[in-house]
Amino acid sequence: MRHQYVYAVFPRAYSKSFLSMMVLMIRCILYPKCKLFVTSGGKEQAAGIMKEKVQEICTLIPAFKKEIDWTRGVTLEGKDYCKYVFHSGSYFDNIVARETSRGKRRHGGVIEECATVDGTILSEVIIPTMNVSRLCMDGSTHPEEQLNKSQLYITTAGWKNTFPYDKLIQLLVWQIIKPEKSMVIGGTYRIPVLVKLLDKNFVRDLKMDGTFNEASF
């Protein structure tokens, strides 16, 4: 929330998608008329993540549900497209990591499972959608606002010599140069096991499974 660029690497069951959707919802409430997005390697994947996590958040915290305009035709929940419109005039939806998304305008967003997103499309299509800063309620713009151009990269472990790895190193360097804007965070499977989101016996079985790829966990 307090950083413009965040790169988060966590294992399965760490609630990374849950928390990233909550971040978007909070920003939509606090920043009127902002336009945010979620993208991933597949269109249906992003829509599925959004729908599942938003419904879960609204069930656990009903106050969030009251902030969303559930009028028919306003908030949309489909198989390959979801859009959540808030009473503040803000919204977030999913956009496709393809050439067809060129020309769209958003103020910030989440790149889910960024290890599977094409680096060229991300650099030439997705990131340029954030060229325009949010217009405040008084008609002014504040380019220095943390919301503008905000990029939250979420993924499980990936591989070296790839675009996501290069982006991770870039943000790690920025964290040293400008710590107020950039942050790189990560975690292990021990936290999900500790809070009972992940069964330790299941993790132990995976470790002993010779056919399981550890990098995919």
Would you name each region that the model predicts?
Residues 1-217:
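Phosphate/NTP-binding elements of NTP-utilizing enzymes
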